[in-house]
């Protein structure tokens, strides 16, 4: 067991979930693989120190409860306190899209990008129908399921989510400026950089940058050097604003530029036309003669790796993933997928 999780050995939470090993870190805490000792089922456990300066696991657990039942929303098993921790027990999921991008040597085919776009738009739309915006749309926060859910995309990490309208009155939050940037600068909308209160349009614009990240391998505002975080954010913002959508999307189907221009043109309170955006990509998908068969790029690679492993007389090295760019975290997240 890794030293980081050594102190958690024999740590049982919620009366029946025994921690096994650390499998990742969220924005505000560590995530562990755990086993339900009553039936052997594997689950994920998110731990947050009760001494955390900005505790948010209770808030996140409440949000998951509001979202329960939605397609691609993890099921919550238990929330409570154990020893010095706030604890959230939820479905165990597979690797993130960032992990899978690395697994595929940081190249996704257009077919994979378009199949993902369809599910990603639907996940964000569902959160919006529940009166919340996510505010941290990025590849790390989309995870594939496992087992019978292995082709289903899940949206996670609602610690930064915010209610944008009242459940009963449907009153939208007011337009404001001078807000600090919430979320991840690489994928943040231009308005978020400008300090404008986020709304539905910003989640959708962020998704546009995620899709172009997958298409291009990187975004023009990645890798900028600066002395401070604030200066780096300013450089990212400047580069993002000075890169025309047509330049960002050059060499890729026009639908990606259409998507981003549409999102950037939305008014603060305006509801995005999710079906229009899905149809943009669905029609492109059909035009390119692809079949919606859930055969993603990693599906093929996993099959190849399994065949290599089988034909290499049990030498585990042959089954290694085909890129040297992974972290140990990527490897651990790919196991059992």
UniProtKB/Swiss-Prot annotation:
Chief location category: cytoplasm
Modification Phosphoserine occurs at: 4
EC numbers, comma separated: 2.7.11.1
Residues the entry annotates as binding ATP: 23-31, 46
Protein's GO biological process: cell division; cell surface receptor signaling pathway; cellular response to nutrient; Golgi organization; intermediate filament cytoskeleton organization; negative regulation of canonical Wnt signaling pathway; negative regulation of NLRP3 inflammasome complex assembly; positive regulation of proteasomal ubiquitin-dependent protein catabolic process
Signal peptide, first to last residue: none
Disordered: region residues: 309-337
Molecular function terms, GO-annotated: ATP binding; protein kinase activity; protein serine kinase activity; protein serine/threonine kinase activity
Active-site residues per Swiss-Prot or TrEMBL entry: 136 (proton acceptor)
UniProtKB keywords: Acetylation, ATP-binding, Cell cycle, Cell division, Cell projection, Centromere, Chromosome, Cytoplasm, Cytoskeleton, Kinase, Kinetochore, Mitosis, Nucleotide-binding, Nucleus, Phosphoprotein, Serine/threonine-protein kinase, Transferase, Wnt signaling pathway
Low complexity: bias regions: 309-325
PROSITE patterns attached to this UniProt entry: PROTEIN_KINASE_ATP, PROTEIN_KINASE_DOM, PROTEIN_KINASE_ST
A Pfam entry, by short name: Pkinase
GO CC term, one of those recorded: ciliary basal body
Modified residues (N6-acetyllysine): 8
Highest taxon listed in the record's lineage: Eukaryota
Keyword field contains Cell division: yes
Record's subcellular location: Cytoplasm; Cytoplasm, Cytoskeleton, Microtubule organizing center, Centrosome; Chromosome, Centromere, Kinetochore; Nucleus speckle
Protein kinase domain segment(s): 17-285
Reaction equation(s) it catalyzes: L-seryl-[protein] + ATP = O-phospho-L-seryl-[protein] + ADP + H(+); L-threonyl-[protein] + ATP = O-phospho-L-threonyl-[protein] + ADP + H(+)
PTM comment: Phosphorylated by MTOR in response to mitogenic stimulation, leading to its activation.
Subunit field text: Interacts with the Axin complex. Interacts with TUT1, leading to TUT1 phosphorylation. Interacts with FAM83A, FAM83B, FAM83C, FAM83D, FAM83E, FAM83F, FAM83G and FAM83H (via DUF1669). Interaction with FAM83H recruits CSNK1A1 to keratin filaments.
Family the UniProt entry places it in: Belongs to the protein kinase superfamily. CK1 Ser/Thr protein kinase family. Casein kinase I subfamily.
Protein name: Casein kinase I isoform alpha
Organism: Homo sapiens (Human)
């Amino acid at each position: 067991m890794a030293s980081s999780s050594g102190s958690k050995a024999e740590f049982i939470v919620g009366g029946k979930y025994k921690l096994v090993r650390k499998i990742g870190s969220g924005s505000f805490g560590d995530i562990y693989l755990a086993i339900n000792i009553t039936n052997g089922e594997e689950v994920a456990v998110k731990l947050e120190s009760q001494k955390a300066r900005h505790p948010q696991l209770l808030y996140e657990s409440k949000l998951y409860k509001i979202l329960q039942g939605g397609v691609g929303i993890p099921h919550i098993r238990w929330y409570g306190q154990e020893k010095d921790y706030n604890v959230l027990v939820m479905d165990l999921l597979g690797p993130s899209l960032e992990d899978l991008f690395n697994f595929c040597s940081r190249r996704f085919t257009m077919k994979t990008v378009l199949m993902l776009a369809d599910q990603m738009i639907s996940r964000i739309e569902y959160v919006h129908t529940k009166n919340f915006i996510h505010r941290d749309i990025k590849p790390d926060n989309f995870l594939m399921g496992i087992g019978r859910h292995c082709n289903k995309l899940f949206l996670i990490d609602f610690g930064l989510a915010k209610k944008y309208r009242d459940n009963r009155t449907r009153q939208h939050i007011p337009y404001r400026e001078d807000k600090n940037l919430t979320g991840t600068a690489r994928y943040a909308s231009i308005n978020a950089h400008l300090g404008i209160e986020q709304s539905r349009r910003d989640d959708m614009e962020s998704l546009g940058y995620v899709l172009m990240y997958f298409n291009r391998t990187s975004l023009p505002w990645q890798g900028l050097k600066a002395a401070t975080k604030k200066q780096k954010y300013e450089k990212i913002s400047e580069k993002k604003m000075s890169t025309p959508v047509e330049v960002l999307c050059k060499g890729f189907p026009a639908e990606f530029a259409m998507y981003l221009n549409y999102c950037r043109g939305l008014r603060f309170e305006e509801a995005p036309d999710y079906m229009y955006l899905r149809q943009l990509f669905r029609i492109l998908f059909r035009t390119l003669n692809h079949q919606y068969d859930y055969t993603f790029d990693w599906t093929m690679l996993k099959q190849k790796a399994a065949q290599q492993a089988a034909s290499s007389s049990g030498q585990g090295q042959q089954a290694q993933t085909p890129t040297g760019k992974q972290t140990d975290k990527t490897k651990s997240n790919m196991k059992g997928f």
